[in-house]
Amino acid sequence: MDAAALIDKFLQFGEDRKIEEMQAMMAPQSRIEFPGGKLFSTQTEMVTNAKGRYTWIKKHRDRYFVGVNGDQTTVTSIGTLYGENLAGVPFDGIRYVDVFVIENGLIKEQMVWNDLCESGVLDVK
């Protein structure tokens, strides 16, 4: 499986809330960084932190960029977020960029950037 397909599968597991499958794709002692500098070491920690922010969220995964640097492959996924906030109001079109560093076939780093908070959609009632 090529690197972009690996990340697409990982992101689909996230949308399907198959957290154990996601974690199996992560390297030991991996690093997950979210907006605001929030750091996690497991997908379970990340999902637990996200509870209470929205009812559900998914991604329109528009493009992937792949680069290789020695033993590491970096995959960047660009697209938009859509979902439903806690008040039941749908949202769509929120920009995101996810960067993944893969080493030995496992995700070593996941860095997430998005406009979710800036958009104000989580506060709409």
Predicted regions and their residues:
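Hydrophobic pocket/interface hotspot
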Residues: 10, 22-23, 30, 46, ...
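A short hydrophobic beta-strand element
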Residues: 71-81
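Exposed beta-sheet edge and beta->alpha loop/turn motif
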Residues: 80-104
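Low-complexity, intrinsically disordered terminal/linker segments enriched in charged
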Residues: 109-125
